[in-house]
């Protein structure tokens, strides 16, 4: 039903009624300081509305699956975006991994949702008939203290490969 409606209020309601998890760990409360057991996974969202030049999410998912550190890639609950689950090795550096991923994806001209920097971010269940799963994905090791992607020179961004955009 969520993927069938264009009514934004109805979409929000339907999405909020879906089962959900916190990908990055088990929490006693949904607060960063309430982490009980980390999973050493980060989930990033790539929304279609933020990336209008991506016209085919299925083809785009296949491109994301080529990244050696992507463990899982699937369609978002709306079907208009994608998400990736990526392993890392130090939960204390969650935001630093996110910053590096945000920069790396920006260089590929892909905007990832900045709210994914939150270690207790909720991930709503979504169905994907053709998810990508790689149990042998590489552990992501890059970190970055701060991300200042808004100030990247356009030459830096647009000199990167445009073949990511489908």
Predicted regions and their residues:
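DNA replication initiation modules
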Residues: 28-52, 88-165
């Amino acid at each position: 039903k969520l993927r069938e409606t264009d009514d934004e209020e109805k979409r929000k309601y339907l999405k909020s009624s879906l089962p959900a998890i916190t990908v990055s760990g088990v929490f006693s409360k949904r607060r960063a300081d309430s982490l009980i057991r980390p999973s050493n996974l980060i989930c990033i969202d790539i929304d279609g509305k933020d990336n209008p030049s991506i016209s085919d999410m299925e083809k785009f998912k296949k491109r994301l699956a080529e990244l050696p550190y992507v463990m899982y890639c699937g369609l978002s609950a709306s079907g208009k975006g994608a998400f990736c689950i990526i392993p890392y090795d130090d939960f204390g550096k969650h935001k630093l991994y996110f910053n590096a991923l945000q920069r790396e994806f920006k260089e590929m001209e892909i905007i990832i949702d900045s709210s994914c920097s939150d270690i207790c971010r909720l991930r709503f269940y979504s169905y994907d008939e053709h998810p990508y799963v790689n149990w042998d994905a590489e552990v992501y090791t890059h970190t970055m203290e701060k991300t200042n992607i808004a100030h990247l020179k356009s030459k830096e961004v647009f000199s990167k490969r445009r073949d990511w955009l489908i």
